A protein has these predicted regions:
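Helix-loop boundary and gating motifs at the non-cytosolic
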Residues: 2-66, 229-264
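Glycine-rich segments within core transmembrane alpha-helices of 12-TM secondary carriers
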Residues: 63-67, 145-163
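Helix-to-loop junctions at the C-terminal end of transmembrane segments
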Residues: 66-80, 167
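Cytoplasmic membrane-interface "Motif A"-like loop-to-helix N-cap segments
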Residues: 75-88, 173
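C-terminal ends and interior cores of transmembrane alpha-helices
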Residues: 87-105, 165
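Hydrophobic core of transmembrane alpha-helices in multi-pass small-molecule transporters
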Residues: 105-124
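Symmetry-related core transmembrane helices of the 12-TM Major Facilitator Superfamily/SLC fold
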Residues: 175-194
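Helix-loop junctions on the cytosolic side of multi-pass membrane transporters
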Residues: 189-208
């Protein structure tokens, strides 16, 4: 089996194509609320305080803690429906930024929408992990998810790289950029809605049973206690993330305020 040919069933293959098509457009909305993009816009257009820049940089990390909440919300429910709802709410955050004019109120909406979108994105990641575990066998999963993430990464880099030159050339085009992102997000949402999950009925029954009898489900803390390798992995991820949190906010502040650099 090659990296590209996963030898999926016909149903799963259609869903996989829908997911890949969604990754070509949905990041157009999500990238506009990334910490790096929002941080630069907030610093250059709204001249926000350093504390706000720190909040923008830290929001994605702290938003990941909401995964516990989202796993409970999605338990016993259609995973595609939950993911689509969360995607729609992220698009609403993008539209909110496009609608609000510049000024102090605009900076509040921009930062609030960014934080809300990170929490919602954590829910999408949580739900999609269940979709992937059901649709792709263990020997297929890494290849499938790597293809999806590669598409996502390429589109994210292309769009984020285009935003800087566009704002340098047209400084007042922020609203149009976010409207365009919202349209791309709606297209990605429509494509993702075509995904079907194999064996979801049995999974939902199992989740409802575990929700009624929580003592039968192994929690995250219990896994940390019993799985030494996973515990070590999480400790290293925490250390790596801590370093990333420290550097982004000061970097944005130095480049935009002290160096007075352009968007590019």
């Amino acid at each position: 089996m090659s990296w590209a040919d996963l030898k999926l069933s016909q149903t799963v293959e259609r869903s996989f194509r829908a997911e890949k098509a969604s990754e070509l457009s949905l990041p157009g909305a999500i990238v506009l609320l990334e910490g790096g993009v929002v941080g630069v816009i907030a610093a250059k257009i709204y001249a926000v305080e350093p504390l706000t820049l720190a909040l923008i940089s830290a929001a994605p990390m702290f938003a990941n803690l909401s995964s516990f909440f989202w796993s409970k919300i999605a338990a016993g429910r259609s995973k595609v429906a939950v993911a689509c709802l969360l995607q729609a709410l992220i698009i609403a955050c993008v539209v909110a930024v496009a609608l609000v004019p510049s000024g102090e109120w605009g900076s509040f909406v921009l930062v609030s929408s960014m934080i809300a979108s990170r929490v919602l994105l954590a829910g999408i990641v949580t739900v999609r992990s269940v979709i992937w575990s059901l649709n792709y066998a263990r020997h297929q999963r890494a290849r499938a998810t790597s293809q999806l993430q590669m598409i996502n990464a390429v589109i994210t880099v292309l769009i984020s790289s285009a935003i800087g030159p566009l704002l340098d050339t047209y400084p007042n085009s922020v609203a149009w950029i976010y409207w365009t992102g919202a349209v791309l997000g709606c297209l990605g949402l429509a494509l993702f809605a075509q995904v079907r999950v194999v064996g979801e009925g049995r999974q939902r029954v199992r989740e409802r049973r575990e929700r009624r009898n929580p003592e039968t489900a192994m929690g995250f803390l219990e896994i940390l206690k019993t799985d030494r390798l996973f515990r070590w992995y999480q400790m290293n991820m925490f250390a790596a993330g801590f370093g990333a949190m420290l550097i982004e906010a000061p970097l944005i502040f130095i480049i935009t305020r002290q160096m007075q650099a352009s968007y590019t």
